């Protein structure tokens, strides 16, 4: 079963003014779509791999044939990362988490503000292209960043919040002002979705 581009859970202009309509359209229909197309192309001659989930492929890259390993890493990672990214954004987002996730953030980072600062630093400090992440690792929250389209899944960690800091994610609106894009991100985080992913990751 070939992988498919997921539909966005909101219109392309829904995240304005924080992320502009044109960026969302190009990011979803061109960039993400290309990762899906190239992932399917890499798996084409390998029917034994076509029934595996994205998580199964990415968590065990070493088991893949060397000839397609890099293509699956880059394009499978890109597909996984963006599929998560769209769901943790919402036009009704922002604010702060509540409940179990809020408690875990306060316990691990001291406060929500301290968490935001550390996450923002990880995003701003990622040289070149990549992602900043809040992950669950052995039941614990952790902030990390990955280069290119690498996914925390490749390291055995479960991502629950991610921020794309590739220039294609923000350049049309913010140009080289990555910190402004990072600051705007907090206005559209869907904390209900992040909390749901946190509960699921803890139950693994």
UniProtKB/Swiss-Prot annotation:
It catalyses: 2 superoxide + 2 H(+) = H2O2 + O2. Its cofactor is Mn(2+). Transmembrane segments: none annotated. The modification Phosphothreonine is found at residues 34, 70. One of its GO terms (cellular component) is cytoplasm. Its EC number is 1.15.1.1. Binds 1 Mn(2+) ion per subunit. Keywords: Manganese, Metal-binding, Oxidoreductase, Phosphoprotein. Mn(2+) binds at residues 27, 82, 164, 168. GO terms for molecular function: metal ion binding; superoxide dismutase activity. It holds the Pfam family Sod_Fe_C. The keyword Transcription regulation does not apply. It comes from the Bacteria. Homodimer. Belongs to the iron/manganese superoxide dismutase family. Destroys superoxide anion radicals which are normally produced within the cells and which are toxic to biological systems. This is Superoxide dismutase [Mn]. The gene is sodA.
